[in-house]
């Protein structure tokens, strides 16, 4: 039996982080890039630091051994996540082999 984790990213508010707060959100990465962007904007709007604008990807789940950079484009994150959501562990192994 294979385990399946929906690819997701933890995006942190850097303004909050730099001021001693841990504020961020786990976001489903297997969606359109604009939807990821909207979720990040909502997370920033709820930040304990007013007018927060900067973010970074601090953690990922469901991407196998693939490395997701902290400033990876939402388009790239979305493409990888959609592929992995569709193909699971075998898809992760293929991507890992060719990266």
Regions found by a protein language model. Give the residues of each.
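Structured domain cores in non-transmembrane regions
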Residues: 33-99
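N-terminal ordered "arm"
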Residues: 2-46
């Amino acid at each position: 039996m294979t385990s399946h984790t929906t690819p997701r990213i933890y995006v942190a508010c850097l303004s909050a982080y730099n001021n001693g707060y841990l504020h961020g959100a786990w976001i489903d990465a297997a969606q359109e890039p604009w939807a990821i962007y909207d979720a990040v904007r909502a997370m920033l709007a709820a930040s304990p630091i007013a007018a927060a604008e900067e973010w970074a990807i601090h953690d990922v789940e469901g991407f196998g051994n693939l490395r997701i950079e902290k400033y990876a484009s939402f388009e790239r994150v979305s493409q990888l996540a959609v592929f992995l959501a569709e193909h699971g562990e075998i898809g992760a192994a293929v991507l890992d082999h060719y990266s």
